[in-house]
Amino acid sequence: MKSSKNDTFVYRTWVKTLVVYFVMFVMSAVVPITAMFPNLGYPCYFNALVDYGALNLTNYNLAHHLTPTLYLEPPEMFVYITLVFIADCVAFIYYACGEVALIKARKKVSGLTDLSAWVSAVGSPTVLFLAILKLWSIQVFIQVLSYKHVFLSAFVYFLHFLASVLHACACVTRFSPVWVVKAQDNSIPQDTFLWWVVFYLKPVVTNLYLGCLALETLVFSLSVFLALGNSFYFMVGDMVLGAVNLFLILPIFWYILTEVWLASFLRHNFGFYCGMFIASIILILPLVRYEAVFVSAKLHTTVAINVAIIPILCSVAMLIRICRIFKSMRQGTDYVPVSETVELELESEPRPRPSRTPSPGRNRRRSSTSSSSSRSTRRQRPVSTQALVSSVLPMTTDSEEEIFP
């Protein structure tokens, strides 16, 4: 069966967007690598943004100079860029496999809207557009960091973080109700390459994206307070404590969002929790390396407690997710969309007619009326019907006494 014109248009749009995504992926892979080598057009090494040797938590912002605050050092920044690059490589392989799977599955289209449902299951054009926006913004972020523009880099990374949040939600929910997602998944032919891509490879890619989102939450928190610390007359220690507290608060909203909304679409979404553990390790490294600086500013205990709360809250949220998974497995409740064909059995139960004493002068008229009524009742006897949307109930002839008193 051929797909509808609307589905064909959606598929062609998806293919063109996928080509742009592949090109943007290559560019996002080239930019970080070239930015690490000198004499290739980048003025500075983007990883070395903050010199922790000059870190003083009791100082205030110095005009016309980059005041060092809490940020990623070259090893941590390299780990972050590498993990994001690995996730993008896996996503590249996933979308390439998805395109091959859709080409093979087009031969098994059995409905007018099957192709668009499969495209949405793999990744709609909206998801690809958000992925392209992520790849573009991370390139701009690296280039801006090379020029040491901390204010512009914070703004660019805010756009990148916003695109990452929307992209993660789109990968999990497809911005559709649960029953629509179930209907799209049920339309995929079983034991096919498309089935394997959607139900086995896509959860892995989604969890990798969620893990990267946790790391991006850390970088976003540090970037915001790095820009604030170099824009206003604030103490460096306050900016460090503010960055830690922001990274402590933001994941709580994601934990709540996961249990309220995202868990209905993807139960085993542990990528964000794993990313939070890695981000906590990255955040605690400066506290360990430069312990004397934090101790002299009397911030070591406060920052250490706040940093320790982050993995504790993550562990609690992960335990809640695991308990809810086991609870749903015990209940065995799985909601599926109702079939389009509904069978209704309409049983015929004659209604009791009130007994009245007929008038002698109208016996002949009543007998003729009752005979016609019995014939119409036989014609309108309810039968078992099969309706696609709604069933028409048989008309009943209750009593002719209301017409012929």
From Swiss-Prot:
Residue spans of biased composition, Polar residues class: 386-397
Topological type in the membrane: Multi-pass membrane protein
Principal location: virion
Intravirion face of the membrane: 1-17, 98-121, 171-192, 267, 321-405
Annotated signal peptide: none
Location in the cell: Virion membrane; Host Golgi apparatus, Host trans-Golgi network; Host endosome membrane; Host nucleus inner membrane
Source domain of life: Viruses
Keyword Glycoprotein listed: yes
Keywords (A to Z) from UniProt: Disulfide bond, Glycoprotein, Host endosome, Host Golgi apparatus, Host membrane, Host nucleus, Membrane, Transmembrane, Transmembrane helix, Viral envelope protein, Virion
Pfam family, one: Herpes_glycop
A GO CC term attached to the entry: host cell endosome membrane
Keyword DNA-binding assigned: no
Domain notes: The highly charged and proline-rich cytoplasmic tail might interact with the virion tegument.
Protein family per UniProt: Belongs to the herpesviridae glycoprotein M family.
Summary of the function given for this chain in its UniProt record: Envelope glycoprotein important for virion assembly and egress. Plays a role in the correct incorporation of gH-gL into virion membrane. Directs the glycoprotein N (gN) to the host trans-Golgi network.
Subunit structure and binding partners: Interacts (via N-terminus) with gN (via N-terminus). The gM-gN heterodimer forms the gCII complex.
Name of this chain's protein: Envelope glycoprotein M
